[in-house]
Regions:
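N-terminal helix-loop segment corresponding to the beta1-alpha1 unit
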Residues: 1-201, 348, 378, 384-416
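A glycine-rich dinucleotide-binding beta-alpha-beta segment and adjacent secondary-structure elements
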Residues: 319-373
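Substrate-binding/catalytic subdomain of NAD(P)-dependent oxidoreductase enzymes
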Residues: 193-234
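A short glycine-threonine-serine/GTX helix/turn-capping micro-motif
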Residues: 170-180, 202-204, 234-244, 255-256, ...
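Mid-domain beta-loop-alpha active-site segment that forms a flexible
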Residues: 175-190, 209-217, 261, 265
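Aromatic-enriched alpha-helical interface/lid elements that frame and gate functional surfaces
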Residues: 243-320, 324
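Short Gly/Pro-enriched turn/cap motifs at secondary-structure boundaries
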Residues: 68, 234-239, 245-246, 353-356, ...
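Short, well-structured beta-strand/strand-turn elements
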Residues: 38-41, 318-332, 393-398
Length: 416
């Protein structure tokens, strides 16, 4: 059963989502999860390019637009050509209506569209203007296009730090850096809203993919800043530490052991696997010896883990209360009971008797309800409705269509 609108934390908060792809729109999605009203503004014709990203390999194949549903639930869509001079009055009224504006246009594009903070602030001095860039607002690359994989993963060094010495850098799952950056922008917006409560004034907040990539890799980036010596790429066959590594089981699965408290965990592990010979081996007698002989220990553990299936190893490691993780496959992830017990995945409110599920935003407030995820909008689905709410009458809307500021009909994604 859904809660009344007034029960949500951000009921009455109005958000304009001018952003594209994932990071900016996902920040607006988190606001919508707590009751904010979000209007997604898209160019007529193709709309947000993220509408079609799911069709691009190596994304999993499905006719239904799963990525769009995830990032744009609980939003209304307004198709608006910001390049059209007739759109200026619509933009002015939208900004006057809004509490928050989210964009990820590069600075030069914002200037061209008259969508900078300085352009829109006079329309609404209480506006929270939130922007994301690839490489930051300043510097020689401020206008450089940036994506999750290029600015968050590659530029920050994450790709280098996580790759195996025998392999080139792996292309990660799309959106990992975007979703991390979205939470940063959400935090910035909420901080600015708190400031507005105290001062009555709006402000501009920003973050970038490269900043969040640097924050994600900060433990080792800080080491570099202090002049630490790096051992080079991690070689799985000869790592710095064989007890923080992944091992293949007899049924071709992978289990990651993470014995951070090595001197405490090692004797427990050796006892659990009934390998007293390893305990007595001088090569593995203490942490210093194990690190010096990591390649030999990897060879021993490779043979050991390859001797039994995954289920045997999880039972043994659980019984010994040792820290480990199973490298899950998609079929397991979507059935993981922890995801359902903690409402990490939640049903989509689409009126179906057999609801499908989506990933919820990654935090909750006790005794504070979240909005049930609704179906993401078609391009321009709510254009007329929103224009009427802004005070445009039928004749004015017809004129806007005649001049091309808004499309004549909503677009169906399937027709594009």
């Amino acid at each position: 059963m859904s809660s009344p609108a007034s029960a949500y934390l951000f009921s009455g908060l109005k958000v304009l989502d001018f952003a594209s792809f994932i990071a900016g729109p996902a920040a607006a999605t988190v606001l919508s999860d707590f009751g904010a009203e979000v209007v997604k503004v898209e160019p007529p014709g193709a709309g947000d390019p993220h509408r079609y990203l799911y069709r691009t390999p190596p994304n999993p194949a499905l006719k239904e637009n799963y990525t769009w549903q995830l990032t744009n639930r609980n939003k209304r869509s307004l198709a608006l050509d910001l390049k059209n001079p007739k759109s200026s009055e619509i933009l002015k009224r939208l900004v006057g209506w809004a509490d928050v504006l989210v964009t990820n246009f590069p600075p030069r594009v914002r200037r061209r569209l008259k969508l900078t903070y300085e352009d829109v602030f006079p329309f609404n001095p209480r506006l929270i203007y939130a922007d994301i860039t690839g490489y930051g607002e300043l510097g020689p690359e401020a206008d450089k296009p940036g994506f999750d994989i290029t600015a968050f993963w590659a530029r920050s060094g994450l790709m280098q730090f996580t790759r195996d010495a025998s392999s080139p850098p792996a292309v990660p799952v799309p959106g990992i850096g975007d979703h991390a950056t979205a939470i940063s922008l959400y935090a910035a917006i909420v901080t600015a809203l708190y400031r507005r409560e105290r001062t009555g004034e709006g402000c501009c907040v920003s973050t970038s993919l490269i900043a969040n990539g640097a924050w994600a890799t900060a433990a080792w980036l800080q080491a570099a800043l202090f002049g630490a010596k790096f051992s080079g790429e991690i070689d799985r066959k000869n790592p710095p530490n064989a007890l923080t590594a992944s091992y293949r089981t007899s049924d071709n699965r992978w289990v990651l052991i993470l014995f951070v408290e090595e001197d405490k965990n090692w004797p427990v592990f050796v006892k659990a696997i009934e390998r007293a010979d390893l305990q007595g081996d001088p090569r593995f007698a203490d942490s210093k010896s194990r690190h010096a002989n990591a390649a030999a220990l990897v060879a021993e553990l490779d043979r050991l883990f390859a001797s039994q299936p995954l289920a045997n190893w999880t039972a043994l490691l659980d019984a010994a209360s040792l820290p480990y993780g199973v490298v899950q496959i998609p079929e397991e992830i979507v059935k993981d009971p922890q995801l359902f017990a903690n409402r990490i995945v939640v049903p989509i409110n689409d009126g179906s008797a057999n609801p499908r599920y989506t990933v919820d935003s990654p935090f909750m407030l006790k005794e504070q309800p979240k909005v049930a995820p609704g179906v993401a909008p078609e391009l321009g689905q709510h254009t007329d409705q929103i224009l009427k709410e802004l005070g445009f009458d039928a004749d004015q809307i017809d004129d806007l269509r005649a001049f091309g500021a808004v499309p004549h009909v909503p677009h169906s994604e399937a027709s594009l």
